[in-house]
C-alpha cells in the first residue's frame, strides 16, 4: 500500500515499493542459479526524489561484468531499485531496501551464496544489510559514511564477522572521505580477519579513471568469495596482511589484464 512521508525539506512524496531489476546473467545454458549478486546504487544524503537513473546504469554495467565472469557457476546479478535515492538520516531507507532485497533473493533462489555490492550510499547500505545471515560477502565501493561524532553511535561492524569484506576507495574522492572507510575497515578487521581494503590512487568517487581495474578486482573478489575460486595474489595478500598493510593495498594499473585473471 502506498503512503505519504515527509522527508527533510524535500516535501511530501509518495513512497515506492523496492524491487529487484531484471536478472543479469541468466541464459538458456544456465540450468541453475549458483550465486547471487545484489547491486546497490549510489544515492544522496538527503532527498525525496526517486532512484537515480545514472546510478542505476553504473551498477548495471558492473553487474553485467560480474555475471559474465561468473557465468559457469550460474551467477546472476540484480540491481536493487530503491524506494528513493535519499538516506535521510535515521530513516536509512536504502539499507532497509537492501535487507528486503536479500530476503527476496532467498525467496527466489533458495540457499545460494549472496554478495552485496554497493557504491557510495549503496555501499553503506550493503554494509548495514550484511547482518542478514544469508549474506556471504560485501563489496563496498567508495562508501559514503558519516563523520565520526563522539555523541553518535559509530557505524556498526560486529555483524560483519563471518563475511568476506572488500572496501575500495579512490584517494582523490571529494564526495566521500577515504579516511572514514579506512577507519571503518580498521575497526572491522579487529574482529574479522576476512576484511581488506584497496586504495585507487588519484581516482575520484566514481572510480572512472581505473574502471577496468576496479571491475576486475570486483570480479576476482566476488567469484573467490562465493565460489572459492583462487583470489588474485594482491587480494589474497590484502586479506592476510595485518593493518595498515591490508587496508591500504594499492590497486595496480593493469590489474586483471594478465592471462587467466
Question: Where are the predicted features?
Answer:
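Short beta-strand/loop motif that positions the catalytic acidic residue
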Residues: 160-162, 166-173
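Short alpha-helix in the alpha/beta-hydrolase fold that links the catalytic acid
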Residues: 153, 177-187
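Acidic catalytic loop of the alpha/beta-hydrolase fold
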Residues: 146-147, 171-177
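Alpha/beta-hydrolase active-site loop
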Residues: 88-108
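Short, surface-exposed "cap/lid" segments of acyl-processing enzymes
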Residues: 4-72
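Active-site nucleophile loop of the alpha/beta-hydrolase fold
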Residues: 140-147, 203
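C-terminal catalytic histidine-bearing segment of alpha/beta-hydrolase fold enzymes
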Residues: 182, 193-261
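Gly/Ala-rich beta-loop-alpha elbow adjacent to hydrolase catalytic centers
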Residues: 117-126
Amino acid at each position: 500500500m502506498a503512503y505519504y512521508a515527509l522527508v527533510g525539506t524535500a516535501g511530501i512524496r509518495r513512497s515506492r515499493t523496492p524491487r529487484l531489476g531484471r536478472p543479469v546473467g541468466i541464459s538458456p545454458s544456465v540450468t541453475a542459479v549458483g550465486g547471487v549478486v545484489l547491486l546497490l546504487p549510489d544515492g544522496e544524503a538527503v532527498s525525496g526524489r526517486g532512484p537515480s537513473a545514472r546510478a542505476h546504469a553504473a551498477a548495471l554495467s558492473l553487474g553485467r561484468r560480474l555475471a559474465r565472469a561468473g557465468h559457469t557457476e550460474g551467477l546472476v546479478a540484480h540491481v536493487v531499485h530503491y524506494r528513493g535515492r535519499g538516506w535521510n538520516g535515521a530513516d536509512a531507507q536504502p539499507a532497509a531496501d537492501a535487507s528486503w532485497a536479500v530476503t527476496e533473493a532467498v525467496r527466489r533462489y533458495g540457499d545460494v551464496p549472496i554478495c552485496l555490492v554497493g557504491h557510495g550510499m549503496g555501499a553503506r547500505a550493503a554494509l548495514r544489510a550484511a547482518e542478514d545471515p544469508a549474506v556471504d560477502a560485501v563489496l563496498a565501493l567508495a562508501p559514503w559514511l558519516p563523520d565520526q561524532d563522539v555523541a553518535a553511535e559509530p557505524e556498526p561492524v560486529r555483524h560483519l564477522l563471518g563475511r568476506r569484506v572488500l572496501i575500495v576507495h579512490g584517494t582523490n574522492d571529494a564526495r566521500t572521505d577515504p579516511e572514514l572507510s579506512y577507519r571503518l575497515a580498521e575497526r572491522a578487521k579487529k574482529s574479522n580477519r576476512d576484511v581488506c581494503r584497496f586504495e585507487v590512487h588519484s581516482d575520484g568517487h566514481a572510480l572512472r579513471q581505473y574502471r577496468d581495474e576496479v571491475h576486475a578486482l570486483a570480479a576476482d573478489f566476488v567469484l573467490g568469495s562465493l565460489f572459492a575460486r583462487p583470489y588474485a595474489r594482491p587480494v589474497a595478500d590484502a586479506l592476510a596482511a595485518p593493518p595498515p598493510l591490508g587496508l591500504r593495498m594499492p590497486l595496480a594499473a593493469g590489474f586483471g589484464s594478465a592471462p587467466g585473471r
